[in-house]
Amino acid sequence: MKKTLNEVVKDRIMILDGAMGTMIQQYALTEEDFRGYRYRKTPGLMKGNNDMLNITRPDVVSDIHHKYLEAGADIITTNTFSSQRISQADYHLEEAAREMALAGARLARKAADEFATDERPRFVAGSVGPTNKTCSMSPDVSNPAAREIDYLTLYDVYLEQIEALVEGGADIILIETVFDTLNAKAAIDATMEAERRTGKTLPIMLSITVSDLAGRTLSGQTLEAVLASVSSYPLFSIGLNCSFGAPQMKPFLKELARKSPYYISAYPNAGLPNSMGEYDETAESMAPQMQEYVDEGLVNIIGGCCGTTEKFIAEYAKIVEGKQPHTPQPKSQTMWLSGLELLDVTPDIRFVNVGERCNVAGSRKFLRLINEKNYDEAVSIARKQVADGALVIDINMDDGLLDAREEMRTFLNIIASEPDIAKVPVMIDSSKWDVITAGLQCVQGKAIVNSISLKEGEEVFLSHARDVMRYGAAVVVMCFDEKGQATTYERRIEIAERAYRLLTEKVGMNPLDIIFDPNVLAIATGMSEHDNYALDFIRATEWIRKNLPGAHISGGVSNLSFSFRGNNYIREAMHAVFLYHAIGKGMDFGIVNPATKVAYGDIPTDQLEILEDVVLNRRADASERLVDLAEKIKLQQEALKNGAAQGATTATAAEPEWRKADVAERLSTALVKGVADYMDADLQEALAAYPKAVDIIEGPLMAGMNKVGELFGCGKMFLPQVVKTARTMKKAVAILQPYIEADKKEGTTTAGKVLMATVKGDVHDIGKNIVDVVMSCNNYEVIDLGVMVPAEQIVKKAVAENVDMIGLSGLITPSLEEMVNVATEMEHAGLDLPIMVGGATTSEMHVALKIAPVYSGIVVWVKDAAQNPLVAQRLMNADDRKKFKAELDDRYARLREEYAAHQQKLSSLDEARKNKLNLFE
């Protein structure tokens, strides 16, 4: 029985053939030889287009194959280095590219079969060159975002070529002379697709060419980085060809052999070209140089590139006789990531700091810069993060008013030209899968995808996982499934284990490429059910590291302290304490600000105790104590700003002072402070002063809620304080409820019926819950559908309950698209119910540009909870409602015009550079 490729390569060092072009030159072919009769009228010169000889002079190509086989080649390469549309476009022969590849493979197959025996099989490697274009570099020095070709175009071109090679009889696909790893990824991707289509196993040989003595590719990667970039793929071999002679290639070959889990190939040039562009090495002089490769156990396959002929191959065949082949290294037991350089996530790194500032959802400055197309300054943010110690850069372009796919591509392309940034891997962060794939198609290194989850079920999860593997990336897996986000220890480990089994058993993903995010959630919110969030994350981290071998742990650390936005010291101190404990249990990735100024060891002991009480949930009053500490620090900072002595800042405003105001002011202040101690007495006094109980709600209590909204909006109140306010409001409502009911019995009817929901994809509900309280206090009947509510459920319930209006809430960027979807579904259902939109990521501009155009009814953006009853009141009045709609239509039209005008004013990067001020003319 004929030996297989895998059997032969384990048994001995295999011989690859030599140069095709060098051999063709020996035949002194003319322009007419290249053209043949068929292409006699094709415009342009054809001489030098060696691949067309497969069609016009197949005898020459066959003769060369025979010579190499006679010299002892085990593997001959097809004459198809440029047999694809991109290269053939230079000769106006795009339509002949597939035929060239097919003919080339058939010629090689026929020759190999003539020499093959069961004991000495001969193999055909389908040659796939890099093309004359690159996916990773700009053709225009003044426009780093530009690309002459994109990944998918290259993929399609390669797929056509590779399918033809397989049809023609190729045993192996040789992706050679790789100078851009992104080009190589496209070729590997196409090869794996050809395998799926044909049902054939296609061993992939990958051969890199380094461009200088520093050992980097033309696109800037080190060989270690290249190895990491392709480490997810099932390669047969990796090696080097072209560029250098054997001595110059040797140190780089040793580097590959030292780290690669694949077989190693080497086919150097016949030395370095002389001043005439010719090669001076002979077969006899080069054989001893290649002997060093063999004797040192560096290679499994050797052959020749530029300048080599069948004589070189005959010499190489002699020197490998009886020699042991290289033994590939075991697969790395650590995660490999790469930009231009390798990031080997070894235990001594301990923690991979993922820079968080290149995120439009998390940085207002970065969002503004991207909106303004100020990429130079946006790039400087990435540069600073790397300088501050970020080992990976997170990039997120998810904003309702941005073309996220285009901005992701643009920014990744630009930073690819900045070596001080591009040296580190990127984390492509988006809630939109098309944005993630667009980003992956721009990255030659091994990136991290952030993220996938089981939220949409196993089928989508597995599909996304296969895409991750297709592009050679690692992946963040959120602990989120069809039931929702995991918030307890038990749910976190349940989802993590399920996802791990699916990824490793059904998709075949390397466990080292899996990074679990067990959900860093806000603590110290004032809600007891949130108190264990950090501790449960830490416990889940420990369990995952012990029970799911190879997997890593990450988290968006800033989420932890969301309650204290505006107080940077408290936030950074919370992060430091959390990371100290989480890293100790195995958390090894984190999306953080690398420039954070607070270290765990620098936190004063008294503060540390309070912070750890919160993070580890060690006492029931931990949140209150942290709020007090935050207030104290805030006062200290304000005193320092005002020039006061640092030690004289512990005084707080005396509570009795606000008690001296009138009852309306006292009620408002009580809400702002979240103090319910005096509520009974104050409300009794107010009931005597106001005609109806509801007037108290709409008057002083709503004034207090308005103030809360203002303070929270500008970061001067923290989430736990807002929750405390909401509870105080609920207490006030409970006290007033009997009086409200009595007023209703006297003829007052419900103000209206409101359906409220946090839209699909969003699990956050605190804002919605506050609106619920406020609306209920204003005599509205509220039907709360909860979180993660699909559009169809909202529509169905609205019809069934005959509601007067709908309130949509969302805290995260994906909610914006889902709100558009809800409005679209309502339009399709023929509804014209008013929609109130609110939440942290929402804006009036988004409503004007995205939601209002798809819905004929009223859509109104509500800035904060306190405004909802005022808006609802206008919506419930038939006459005012018409007037309100006309006002909104006019305002939205103006906003759209302003936005369009602003977009027109923004020059393109090219235009801006052309219009730059020249001080020297």
Residue ranges and their predicted role:
Residues 1-921:
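Domain-level signal for soluble alpha/beta catalytic cores
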